[in-house]
Amino acid sequence: MSMNEDKLIQRDRMRFTKNTLSSSLALLAILFNVLYFVSIYRSDVGSYYYNIILGASVLCNLLFMLTVFLCSEGVKGYKASYAYVLLGIGALQILRIFILPMRAHGATVTLNQQEIVVMQTAQFVRVIVYLAASAVCCFVAGIVGIHKSRVLAAHMATLEQKVA
């Protein structure tokens, strides 16, 4: 078997197999997001987190998980539109670094007449790593999904030309 025949067989198999790499990376992005919000929400420093930003953060996390799960199922079936959504969500994950973690890292609250830092540096680094890892997983899942959907579409077009 030649190299071209191997590639042709691999492309033909794509019609019958799922894009598990993109799907798995999207699910891994959800896992990193869960680690992020557990790390944020379990730290209780006075009443700093109990405001509208926390409510928006909870809503954002729920929407993130629902959307990424839907996209993981979409890219599994080689649908490029879901892969593009994953790229956008990856960009939003990077943007989220500058909302809650940056504000909490620079903030202090007074408890029992003592100034306490809301988010210590170790926690700050941890949540940044979680959000960045989630974003990277979304980006890679999106890029792989777009590439594989294009390869499959091109292969399907050549099959249609052979039939016609």
Give the ranges of each region predicted by the language model.
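Alpha-helical transmembrane segments in multipass membrane proteins, preferentially the mid-helix core
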Residues: 62-73, 140-148
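Membrane-water interface at the C-terminal end of transmembrane alpha helices
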Residues: 129-156
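Cytosolic juxtamembrane helix and N-cap/initiation of the first transmembrane helix
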Residues: 1-35, 144-150, 162-164
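Canonical alpha-helical transmembrane segments of integral membrane proteins
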Residues: 22-37, 59-61, 87-96
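Membrane-interface helix-boundary motifs at transmembrane edges
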Residues: 9-17, 46, 72-82
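Loop-to-transmembrane helix junctions at the membrane interface
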Residues: 66-102
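Generic alpha-helical transmembrane segments
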Residues: 29, 50-68, 93-96, 133-134
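Interfacial non-cytosolic loop connecting adjacent transmembrane helices
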Residues: 41-53, 97-131
